[in-house]
């Protein structure tokens, strides 16, 4: 067995509802690529691996290419995608989109970022709402016993909040109920497209019920909110997993 460290692999994320329309002009079979699948192909006559993945909650793709090819691919996408509205963006934009789509980001939604006053850091899949990542009853993997032991012992839940108005929750804003802090908002955003003001928050289990009234204590002032299930956008994943 040999191990070779190679940093000559670049990742370009190409996201949006028209991404498949653009790619279908250059990549044969791209419409048949299932959600979370990948294919070895070429783009602009350059070798790439294209995956049906992304971090936006929208239909999208990622291109894994050689470092020397990345600038060419990037420039061609921006230039030839301009008529369809293609523009470059940065991770800050993705950070806002993930709030709508319930895409967690370590450590920013975890106790490593917001440690407990009276408990050790570290979160369970049950607390994060990620227990679906383990097949029910599956055993034999590292941490299996601990995973099942902690079921039903959640100290908190990661859950959504829907705020009033258009002022988004501050990152790290205290989540208040009956005048006491009960949690923290890990990320918030107001969507001018979907016209909702939403956030991901850590809160007590008994508060993680749709309609629970709370208050987000922003630095600029308090904002009323209600607990809301996630994702807020495309909850059935019909857009990101669409066929054809």
Task: Write out the residue ranges for each language-model feature.
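Conserved, structured C-terminal
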Residues: 1-244
């Amino acid at each position: 067995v040999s191990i070779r460290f190679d940093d000559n692999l670049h990742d370009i994320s190409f996201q949006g509802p028209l991404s498949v329309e653009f790619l279908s002009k250059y990549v044969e079979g791209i419409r048949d690529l299932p959600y979370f699948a990948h294919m070895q192909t070429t783009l602009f006559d350059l070798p790439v691996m294209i995956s049906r993945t992304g971090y936006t909650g929208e239909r999208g793709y990622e291109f894994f290419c050689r470092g020397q090819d990345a600038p060419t691919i990037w420039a061609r996408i921006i230039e030839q995608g301009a008529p369809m509205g293609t523009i470059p963006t940065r991770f800050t934009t993705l950070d806002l989109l993930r709030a709508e789509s319930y895409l967690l980001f370590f450590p920013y939604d975890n106790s490593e970022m917001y440690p407990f006053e009276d408990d050790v850091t570290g979160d369970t899949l049950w607390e994060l709402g990620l227990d679906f990542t383990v097949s029910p009853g599956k055993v034999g993997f590292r941490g299996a016993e601990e995973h099942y032991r902690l079921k039903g012992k959640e100290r908190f839940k990661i859950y959504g909040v829907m705020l009033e108005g258009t002022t988004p929750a501050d990152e790290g804003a205290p989540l208040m109920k009956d005048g006491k802090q009960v949690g923290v908002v890990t990320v918030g955003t107001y969507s001018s497209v979907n016209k909702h003001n939403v956030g991901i928050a850590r809160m007590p289990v008994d508060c993680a019920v749709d309609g629970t009234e709370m208050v987000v204590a922003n630095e600029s002032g308090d904002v009323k909110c209600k607990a809301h299930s996630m994702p807020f956008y495309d909850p059935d994943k019909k857009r990101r997993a669409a066929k054809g």
